[in-house]
Curated annotation (Swiss-Prot):
It is found in: Cytoplasm. Keywords: Amino-acid biosynthesis, ATP-binding, Cytoplasm, Kinase, Nucleotide-binding, Threonine biosynthesis, Transferase. GO terms for molecular function: ATP binding; homoserine kinase activity. Belongs to the GHMP kinase family. Homoserine kinase subfamily. GO terms for biological process: threonine biosynthetic process. ATP binds at R82, P83, G84, S85, G86, L87, G88, S89, S90, A91, A92. Catalyzes the ATP-dependent phosphorylation of L-homoserine to L-homoserine phosphate. It is an enzyme of class 2 (transferase). GO terms for cellular component: cytoplasm. This is Homoserine kinase. Its main location: cytoplasm. Pathway: Amino-acid biosynthesis; L-threonine biosynthesis; L-threonine from L-aspartate: step 4/5. InterPro entries: GHMP_kinase_C_dom, GHMP_kinase_C_sf, GHMP_kinase_N_dom, Homoserine_kinase, Ribosomal_Su5_D2-typ_SF, Ribsml_uS5_D2-typ_fold_subgr.
Length: 300
């Protein structure tokens, strides 16, 4: 085998109170990543937002992963996730490349090990090593990251709506507005929300999961960056969503809902963005299964 192609889908980190800890995989949108054995490391970026994604391996999340794995490959990324969307646009190439190189060279890394290799790639986008997007991208479902551990949890079936307004929020700038210290009562409330969310997961109760999505940290400080946030959130809940959260650093707003209400929730959210003078697009999707191999090319 001299090349391999994988699909790495979007992810949504934080889920409200699970800041830098929780994340879920979405079935769509996603990147298509082809990795070929080569004499030197190189990257080609095509697709959505390609003009703003560096091809220099030392400045690209996929490139940093290849360097960490010490493999000379040609990486072709067909981007389907808009950069600066809060949907793990930098994590998808990192996660996909880690899985592809592991398979292409038969390295034998576990999914957990691949998560931490892929997390190194996030240095190119966020300036820090963090795994809350690459973990669900690789493992699928819901993941929780704690120190050097990652846990995977299956979620009950539910619809997922991700509405992306035409507002750009970079991970670095969104992190910059967060305070280094928070009041004790806010911390207690956030911990209770995170605990309640996991109670909903254990009980497989999407209603409990949904009402636990709001928080007093990520939402409080980042929602002002999203024009129309309050009315969009209210419209989603009025249309039957279990709960709403800012996806990652934003500006995408994520709604979990009954599968048969997904399109109604998406339409209501987009309408409120439109009333606020903001163009948006919606992804009506479901919980994803993680990076998957879509093609293996054998040597001739």
């Amino acid at each position: 085998m001299d090349s391999i192609t994988v699909k790495a889908s979007a992810t949504s980190a934080n889920l409200g109170a699970g800041f830098d800890v929780m994340g879920i995989a979405l079935e769509s949108p996603g990147d298509i990543i082809r990795v070929e054995k080569a004499d030197e490391l190189s990257i080609v970026v095509k697709g959505r937002g390609a003009e703003g994604i560096p091809a220099d391996p030392e400045k690209n999340t996929a490139g940093l992963v290849a360097l960490a794995m010490d493999k000379k490959v040609r990486i072709t990324i067909k981007s389907g996730i808009r950069p600066g969307s809060g949907l793990g646009s930098s994590a998808a190439p990192a996660a996909g490349t880690a899985v592809a190189i592991n398979e292409l060279f038969s390295l034998g890394y576990s999914k957990e090990e691949l998560v931490w290799i892929a997390a190194r790639g996030e240095m190119a986008a966020a300036g820090i090593v963090h795994a809350d997007n690459v973990a669900p991208c690789i493992m699928g479902g819901l993941t929780l990251v704690c120190n050097n551990y990652v846990e995977h949890v299956e979620l009950p079936p539910m619809g997922v709506v991700a509405v992306l307004p035409e507002i750009v929020v970079s991970t670095k700038s969104a992190r910059g507005i967060l305070p280094q210290q928070v009041p004790l009562q806010e911390m207690v409330l956030n911990v209770s929300k995170a605990a309640m969310l996991m109670a909903g997961v254990v009980k497989k109760d999407p209603v409990i999961i949904g009402r636990s999505l709001s928080d007093t940290f990520n939402e409080k400080y980042r929602s002002p960056l999203i024009k129309g946030y309050g009315s969009v959130r209210e419209a989603a809940l009025d249309s039957g969503a279990y709960g709403v959260a800012i996806s990652g650093s934003g500006p995408t707003m994520l709604a979990l809902c009954p599968e048969d209400r997904s399109f109604d929730v998406a339409a209501a959210m987009r309408k409120k963005f439109e009333e606020a003078g903001v163009v948006s697009e919606a992804y009506v999707t479901c919980i994803g299964k993680g990076v998957r191999i879509i093609n293996r090319d054998e040597e001739e």
